[in-house]
Structures are given as structure tokens and as C-alpha cells.
């Protein structure tokens, strides 16, 4: 019997097939799904911010793109994954609110998306697909069995990436 494992904001969880991982309420946040298809191990990290370098308190590694990805790689390797086999899919990074002036500092979703992609490249993890941007939230369900990432939205349908 498979179960669905809930991943909260600034949280990280792993699952092996047939279990699935879900996170709801991705606005400017990004869900980073990594998986090793050989052992059917997957992880989901729900990051909120692009970098831990400016944070006063960076103790929660899952909160940031840079440390969240390192956490996921480290924990997956402890559970038998090989970093060289890891593949990624991401979703989120929306611009949920319109701000006057539109300074880059307020474009958290876009900054998160860029930071996640840069960190994936840094760790030589191939990004297979992404569903980022826009101005709407997402709920995602990741299946380590198939590598499918189901993206559900309100008003923008559902799709598997």
C-alpha cells in the first residue's frame, strides 16, 4: 500500500516507490524534485528563498535554494542514491503579487527559479523539466516510481512534467 508524504514549507522529505511526495501552496517558493531512477528514490525540497548567504538565521537548510539542494543530495546519497545519477524536476517560482516599481528584490519567484537552476548546474544535476513563473500557485505530487511530476493549478489546469 503506497502512501503520500506531505512536505511543508521550508521542508525536505524522501520517498521510495510506490510512495509519493506532495507539497501544496507553491507560490514564489519552488519545489525541487530529485530522483535516482535506478533505486527509485526521490526527494522533494520546498525552498522559500534563493540564498542562505544573506539570512540572519540559516539553520533550516531546506528554506534556501543553495543549502536545500545540498541537503537533498547529502540525504539521498546516505540512502543509496548516486549523485551522478540524480535527475531534477522543478515547479513554482510564481510572481504572486504586483508591486509598484517592480524592483528585482521583490521578484522572489524569479530569483528562486534562477538560483535553483544555477545550483543544479553547479552540482551537475540534469534538469529534465520545469513549470515555473506565472502568477498562480501550484500543488505538486512527485512519483519516484516513474519520475512523473504532477502539477495542479487553479485556473491553469493540470499537467505532468
UniProtKB/Swiss-Prot annotation:
The keyword Hydrolase applies. CDD domains: CheD. One of its GO terms (biological process) is chemotaxis. The keyword Hydrolase applies. Pfam families: CheD. Gene3D superfamilies: 3.30.1330.200. Keywords: Chemotaxis, Hydrolase. It catalyses: L-glutaminyl-[protein] + H2O = L-glutamyl-[protein] + NH4(+). Transmembrane segments: none annotated. GO terms for molecular function: protein-glutamine glutaminase activity. Its EC number is 3.5.1.44. InterPro entries: CheD-like_sf, Chemorcpt_Glu_NH3ase_CheD, Cytotoxic_necrot_fac-like_cat. Probably deamidates glutamine residues to glutamate on methyl-accepting chemotaxis receptors (MCPs), playing an important role in chemotaxis. PANTHER family: CHEMORECEPTOR GLUTAMINE DEAMIDASE CHED-RELATED. Belongs to the CheD family. HAMAP family: CheD (MF_01440). This is Probable chemoreceptor glutamine deamidase CheD.
Amino acid at each position: 500500500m503506497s502512501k503520500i508524504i506531505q512536505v511543508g514549507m521550508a521542508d525536505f522529505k524522501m520517498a521510495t516507490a510506490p510512495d509519493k511526495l506532495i507539497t501544496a501552496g507553491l507560490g514564489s517558493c519552488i519545489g525541487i524534485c530529485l530522483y535516482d531512477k535506478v533505486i527509485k528514490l526521490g526527494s522533494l525540497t520546498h525552498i522559500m528563498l534563493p540564498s542562505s548567504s544573506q539570512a540572519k538565521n540559516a539553520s533550516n537548510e531546506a528554506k534556501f535554494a543553495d543549502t536545500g539542494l545540498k541537503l537533498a543530495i547529502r540525504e539521498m546519497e546516505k540512502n543509496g542514491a548516486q549523485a551522478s545519477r540524480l535527475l531534477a524536476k522543478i515547479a513554482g517560482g510564481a510572481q504572486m503579487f504586483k508591486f509598484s516599481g517592480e524592483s528585482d528584490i521583490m521578484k522572489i519567484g524569479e530569483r528562486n527559479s534562477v538560483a535553483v537552476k544555477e545550483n543544479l548546474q553547479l552540482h551537475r544535476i540534469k534538469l529534465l523539466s520545469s513549470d515555473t513563473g506565472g502568477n498562480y500557485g501550484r500543488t505538486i505530487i512527485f512519483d519516484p516510481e516513474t519520475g512523473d511530476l504532477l502539477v495542479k493549478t487553479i485556473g491553469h489546469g493540470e499537467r505532468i512534467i
